[in-house]
Amino acid sequence: YYQMGKDNANKELSAFDVCAEIGYKPIKGLQLSLGAELMSGTSQTDTANKVNHSFNPLYGTNHRFNGYMDYFYVGNHLNTVGLLDGYLRIHYTYKKVLFGINGHYFKAASDIRDKRKGATDKLSDNNLGGEVDFTMSYNYTDGVSIQGGYSQFFGSTGLQMLRGTSSLTPTSNWAYIMVIIRPGSVKWPKVGLKM
């Protein structure tokens, strides 16, 4: 995707999002996917600041891309340094049960300024951290399923500089469980893990 024109501040916009993924099914029920997504960003060292290179995924993609923890592009996605998300997904389906594990490595697509005291005009490490997402889904019937998961995020100094705080917890986690009900013969939109 390519975005061009003017942003909300009437500044020139030139941004992109590109993704590549390969998948492999070595045995019945097992699916492996390896991929990377690159969303352009605006460098924090760009003092001219004439062109906005920050890609804006106009609508929410909560949990679908860039990890289930939603550290990036949910509520704080405007005028960012961009994102490189390298990921590996492993999904295994057995009868009515799906197990999934996703691993992500996040890196800023543009320069991050080191905001620590005495670090004037220095660049921070562009490493933003990693994330592991574990999920399990049981398809009870065509209209009812249950899904649960656990995610762990491992932050870095680069993420601390990007967020502008040294008090950022190095690790964050969350867990969830949900029941999905799709009553009747209506074709409901698919949510949760793909069976």
Task: State each model region's role.
Residues L32-L34, I90, I101-G103, M136, ...:
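Membrane-embedded beta-strand positions of outer-membrane beta-barrel proteins
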Residues Y68-Y73, H104-K107, I112-D133, Q147, ...:
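Outer membrane beta-barrel transmembrane domains
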Residues G29-L32, K96-I101, D142-G148, S185-K190:
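Repeated loop/turn-to-beta-strand initiation elements of outer-membrane beta-barrel proteins
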Residues F16-A20, L84-L88, G130-F134, N173-V179:
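Hydrophobic, lipid-facing positions within transmembrane beta-strands of outer-membrane proteins
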Residues P170-M195:
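Outer-membrane beta-barrel "beta-signal"
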Residues G164-L168:
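Short proline/glycine-enriched turn/loop segments at secondary-structure junctions
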Residues D133-L162:
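C-terminal structured domain segments
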Residues Y1-Y94, L98, K107, D111-G118, ...:
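Extracellular/periplasmic loop regions
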